[in-house]
Amino acid sequence: MQKTSIPDFQITAKVVYVPSESRPDEGYHFFAYKITITNTGSTPAQLMSRHWVITDALGKKEEVRGPGVVGLQPKIQPGQTFEYDSACPLTTSTGSMVGRYFFVGESGESFSVEVPEFYLIAPLALH
């Protein structure tokens, strides 16, 4: 009997509002975020592409698809963490992002991992 190893990943996001890059009076809010991807499984896998759905406070959705992340297609070994920084402008002071990363495992199998929804909230939106 052959045992199959299913890759397992934990993904977290940290968001920061960037006031120096934002122009709230003009409807431009700039958010920076750091994504941490940890391979908690027992097999390596390579991140091949991404798909994001970005939603603003008015319900307007924008989809972003592309190869890798920040120009890279990292191979993430078991126990290894890969982090990257990116950014997202919005026309509203709040919004959210949710997505999916598409990987290829060491045996050539393709699979995807959901990026849990995270929120983009300008400090001024809380007052």
Curated annotation (Swiss-Prot):
Start and end residues of each ApaG domain: 3-127
A Pfam family recorded for this sequence: DUF525
Cited SUPFAM superfamilies: ApaG-like
Protein name in the entry: Protein ApaG
The species this protein was found in: Bdellovibrio bacteriovorus (strain ATCC 15356 / DSM 50701 / NCIMB 9529 / HD100)
Record gene name: apaG
